[in-house]
Every structure is written in C-alpha cells, then in structure tokens.
Amino acid sequence: MIGWLHGQIIDKHQPGKLVLDVNGVGYDVETSLNTFFQIENGNQPIGLHIHTIVREDALLLYGFLDKEERSLFRSLIKVNGVGPKLAMTVLSSISPKEFIQCIHQENAALLTKLPGIGKKTAERLVVEMRDSIKQFDGSVSDTFQKQAGSTHSQQEAISALEALGYKPQEAWKVVNKIDNGNKSCEQLIREALQILSSR
C-alpha cells in the first residue's frame, strides 16, 4: 500500500484533484479542499500522507498534508454508509476542529447541513465516532485552536512544514517559539527547519 508520496505537482486545475510527479511517474491524487487550497502552485516539491483504496478496476489515492486529517478520513470511512467520496466532502466542508466539536457535543443538527449528510447519517456519525475521535483530542483540536490565534506568516510556515512531513503540533511549537512578530514566512520556515533538522 502507498502511504506517502513526495514529488512535484504537474496538474492542479480541478479543486480536490491533482497529479503528483514522483520520479517520473504521475499519480492521480484526490484531496480535501482543506489540503488542496493549502498547497501553493509552484515548483516546490510537496509530501502527502496517502490513503490507498484498491478496487478491481482502480487504484485510488487520497492525499492529506497532515496525518491527523488522514486519520480522521480513515475514521469516517469506517462509519456505516460513509464512503471515501462522502468522507472527502465532509473534510472539504468543515474544519477538523469543527467536526470534532460536533461529535463531542453530539451536534447532529449541524452535521446535517453538510452536503450529502442526512439526519440518519449524522446521528450515526455521532454514535459511531464518539470513541474514535478521542485520539484527536491532543492533536488536531489543540493544533487548530492554537493556529486560530497565529499570524498569517505563522500559518503559512506551519502549512509548509506539514507539507514537508512534520507533525502539526511539532511545527506549531517551533514556529511559535521563534516568531517575534516581525519575521516573514520564509524566515520562519528556514529557522524552523534548522531547529527540526538538528533534533
């Protein structure tokens, strides 16, 4: 199974779909809009955490900038009646933090406002994901809460570090530590990489 791809984007015209060139081989990868719009156009290589689904007639690759979003995707597709397409729709329509809060608060009514989610599916999500989202309590939810108060440069730097394979909470800690409020995104990334690579 493919779990990670690192390469250069050669096609990114349709939201949620891209082609990643890895050593001369182009991989069709589907992403959530959350991941898609964090990826900047350009020649910089990126890394994506991949979930692979093998079917008789297709090999489907779903890509995520951070492991936590991929883990949330995997938890979603375990719910009865939720397939990869609907899971991607959910992750494209609501942030991981907001989704986790909905499950914690058993807010099925808000979930029904998401595309493709009816009342029964929303209730099933709340019931079946109650236990599985506990793994995210110290990662996704905290990370998104902390990033909410970050500067734009910090958020850009954190996203770039995540794309390079660093964990969101690890990237946030380092960027927050070195930022004095006056540094550009490029400076933050460069200094953060120096610290992270020396560990």
UniProtKB/Swiss-Prot annotation:
SMART domains named among the record's database cross-references: HhH1
DNA repair in keyword set: yes
Gene Ontology cellular component annotations, sorted alphabetically: cytoplasm; Holliday junction helicase complex; Holliday junction resolvase complex
Superkingdom in the source lineage: Bacteria
InterPro entries in UniProt: DNA_helicase_Holl-junc_RuvA_I, Hlx-hairpin-Hlx_DNA-bd_motif, NA-bd_OB-fold, RuvA, RuvA_2-like, RuvA_C, RuvA_C_sf
Region (Domain I), start-end ranges: 1-65
GO BP terms: DNA recombination; DNA repair
Annotated stretches, region: Domain III: 149-199
Predominant cellular place of this UniProt entry's protein: cytoplasm
Subcellular location: Cytoplasm
Sequence segments annotated as region (Domain II): 66-144
GO molecular function terms attached to this record: ATP binding; four-way junction DNA binding; four-way junction helicase activity
Keyword Glycosyltransferase listed: no
Keywords noted in UniProt: Cytoplasm, DNA damage, DNA recombination, DNA repair, DNA-binding
Protein family per UniProt: Belongs to the RuvA family.
Entries under HAMAP family matching the protein: DNA_HJ_migration_RuvA
Biological role stated in the UniProt entry: The RuvA-RuvB-RuvC complex processes Holliday junction (HJ) DNA during genetic recombination and DNA repair, while the RuvA-RuvB complex plays an important role in the rescue of blocked DNA replication forks via replication fork reversal (RFR). RuvA specifically binds to HJ cruciform DNA, conferring on it an open structure. The RuvB hexamer acts as an ATP-dependent pump, pulling dsDNA into and through the RuvAB complex. HJ branch migration allows RuvC to scan DNA until it finds its consensus sequence, where it cleaves and resolves the cruciform DNA.
Subunit composition and interactions: Homotetramer. Forms an RuvA(8)-RuvB(12)-Holliday junction (HJ) complex. HJ DNA is sandwiched between 2 RuvA tetramers; dsDNA enters through RuvA and exits via RuvB. An RuvB hexamer assembles on each DNA strand where it exits the tetramer. Each RuvB hexamer is contacted by two RuvA subunits (via domain III) on 2 adjacent RuvB subunits; this complex drives branch migration. In the full resolvosome a probable DNA-RuvA(4)-RuvB(12)-RuvC(2) complex forms which resolves the HJ.
Protein name: Holliday junction branch migration complex subunit RuvA
Organism for this UniProt entry: Legionella pneumophila (strain Corby)
